[in-house]
Design a protein with these regions (language model features):
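Contiguous domain-boundary segments centered on the initiation and propagation of an alpha-helix
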Residues: 132-139, 144-151, 459, 463-470
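Catalytic or ion-coupling anion/metal-binding cores of large enzyme and transporter domains
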Residues: 1-69, 75-79, 83, 92-111, ...
Length: 608
């Protein structure tokens, strides 16, 4: 095993020291829960009878009399999400495999799952970020029945995996395995789809043509094929050792998929109450979190994870921040070019070697911790392999060579010497930018600001021809406390059109962008947000703003004394009221009121 890179080691040590007190308290709770009698053995007879009244008699005998392990299944199934539609079949497969192995499994509960592709640019998007914490709560409710010896998490998409993971970590005494469903097969390329969207933004094609293109891109079961938040989730789970190795990007209809799903049950039972007892609270330690951060940077993954994984770490008693990401980004090379960071989709990424190749390269370069617990017996090295079917059985082989150097490159000959995400700071606050998706000649933009209070206002200005010039579009009142921090991906086509006309264009916002966003430089997650008096509340139309992804700065070029004397705008009352009404947004008022900043994970459940 390679010697760990000194910067990776330094960041890990700093996180460990920073988190010493909270991590110790977390592990004390995990150990106390693990020390109790397992599952139903600690419950009263009436409680036990209620828990198992609805399952087959044979399963009841196994649990009550034979004291066999009982595995909780928490599912995010619905068939609005193409990625989650295959999960309808999984509980029966997992229960069958549990019985084969002398155990039992129950669906402990279902959690909501929102498709950001459906709600993009719509009021429902303002529930999207907070759905993560609602999912975590739903996971906790499911597991609170407390009749389980292990857990399996069925979920794939944007907020679902972080929510399931946060919830599972609050039951850190349970061995836990995540079970994905894989991407849909390739349809219309992501690049061609983007071109049609830009044509539609200009009025060159109509709704019929746009819908045909979108339907050709999104055409079946599985995740979207771009490397956005959903597929970044899967890469990070592989790097954390919470999957069966190589499970992430096998298509739902591939015969290998069911074998991998069954293997997930075998894996979780293998670490349940035996010599290799590995509860999720022990698996997810500082090294595991750093491995996830490195994987994100090395693949140019979704900016959303700079929020979500801060929250995930907090759930395990670990504190990370954007400085940690920034320092790692300086030494972690970019190994992958997958849309929006390139033209390939995730199926081509998988064919080139997928997560197995990436993890193998990062381990070899000393950029990942190999000495970690995972859900497999041989540690993270097992995740540097690719699964295949040999005579009806799963077999794994080493992913040592890239199958396509235009998609995946080795660590000693990367696409870039530094990672795909970068921290920006200055008198406009702290923000992040996904540089891997932006051509280098657009990494620095200096232009007058045009300030908007909503994404709809920006779109109206674009349609009116008011933005045909060099411009930095600022969209404020989009943070967690303002309106739930929606994604503003609908702004990508009009801004890309302006950029295509030769103008210098950028977006600055305290909101989020989709993991699919790219092409146009965007300083996002600006903190502190305007709603709490952050610097964006001081900006005015015409202020000269400089976004410099090379130097890592975001600043308004105004005399400092004038800047400090500026009045801080307040969120218009009518806008605040509109953001809190309709589409169930009233129910999330408490979330908006108590949400932490983006850099703190936008958590709604931290009370210290």
């Amino acid at each position: 095993m390679s010697t760990i890179h000194p910067i990776v080691d330094q960041v890990t040590r700093r996180i460990r020291e920073r988190s010493a007190e909270s991590r110790a308290a977390y592990l004390e709770q995990v150990d106390a829960m693990a020390a109790r009698p397992p599952g139903a053995q600690s419950m009263g007879c009436a409680n036990v009878a209620h828990a198992f009244a609805g399952i087959p008699g044979g399963d009841r005998i196994r649990i009550v009399e034979e004291k066999a392990p009982n595995v909780a299944i928490v599912t995010a199934y619905n068939d609005v999400l193409s990625a989650h539609a295959p999960l309808a079949r999984y509980p029966d497969i997992l229960k069958d495999e549990a019985r084969r192995l002398g155990a039992t499994a129950q669906v402990a509960g279902g959690v909501p799952a929102m498709c950001d592709g459906v709600t993009q640019g719509a009021p429902g998007m303002e529930l999207s970020l907070f759905s993560r914490d609602a999912i975590a709560m739903g996971t906790a409710i499911a597991l609170s029945h407390d009749v389980f010896d292990a857990a399996m998490m069925l979920g794939i998409c944007d907020k679902i995996v972080p929510g399931l993971l946060i919830g599972a970590l609050h039951f850190g005494h349970l061995p836990t395995v995540f079970v994905p469903a894989g991407p849909m097969t390739s349809g219309l390329s992501n690049g061609d789809k983007a071109k049609v969207r830009e044509q539609a933004a200009q009025g060159l094609v109509g709704r019929k043509e746009l819908l045909a293109a979108e339907s050709a891109a999104y055409h079946g079961e599985g995740t979207c094929t771009f490397y956005g938040t959903a597929n970044s989730n899967q890469m990070l789970l592989e790097a954390m050792g919470l999957h069966v190795p190589g499970t992430a990007f096998i298509n739902p209809a591939d015969g290998e998929r069911e074998l991998l799903t069954r293997e997930a049950m075998r894996s979780v039972l293998a670490i349940t109450r035996n010599k290799r007892f590995a509860p999720i609270g022990r698996v997810v330690d500082e090294r595991c979190i750093v491995n996830a951060m490195v994987a994100l940077l090395a693949t140019g993954g979704s900016t959303n994870h700079l929020i979500h994984w801060v929250a995930v770490a907090r759930a395990a008693g670990i504190t990370i921040d954007w400085n940690d990401f920034s320092e790692l980004s300086g030494v972690v090379p970019l190994l992958a070019r997958v849309y929006p960071n390139g033209s390939a989709d995730v199926n081509q990424f998988q064919a080139a070697g997928g997560p197995g190749y990436v993890i193998g390269q990062l381990l070899k370069a000393g950029l990942m911790h190999g000495d970690v617990l995972t859900v497999r017996p041989d540690g993270l090295q097992e995740f540097a392999r690719i699964p295949a079917v040999d005579n009806g059985q799963l077999a794994w082989h080493a992913a040592e060579v890239s199958g396509d150097l235009s998609v995946l490159r080795p660590a000693d000959a990367p696409f870039s010497a530094t990672g795909g995400l970068k921290l920006l700071s200055g008198n406009l606050g702290r923000s992040v930018i996904k540089v891997s998706a932006v051509p280098e000649d657009r990494h620095v933009v200096e232009a007058p600001a045009r300030v908007f209070d909503s994404q709809e206002a920006l779109q109206q200005a674009f349609k009116a021809g008011e933005l045909d010039r060099d411009v930095i579009c600022v969209v404020r009142w989009q943070g967690p406390r303002a309106n739930g921090m929606p994604e503003l991906h609908k702004l990508t086509p009009p801004l890309a059109v302006l950029q295509g006309k030769g103008y210098k264009v950028a977006l600055v916002t305290d909101g989020r962008m989709s993991g699919a966003s790219g092409k146009v430089p965007a300083a996002i997650h600006v903190s502190p947000e305007a709603c709490v008096g952050g610097p964006l509340a001081r900006l005015r139309d015409g202020d000269l703003v400089r976004l410099d992804a090379v130097a890592g700065t975001l600043a308004v070029l105004v005399d400092e004394s004038e800047w400090q004397q500026r009045l801080v705008a307040t969120m218009p009352r009518a806008l605040r009221q509109a953001n809190g009404r309709g589409f169930g947004r009233e129910l999330f008022a408490g979330f908006r009121r108590h949400a932490l900043s983006a850099e703190e994970g936008a958590c709604t459940w931290i009370n210290d």
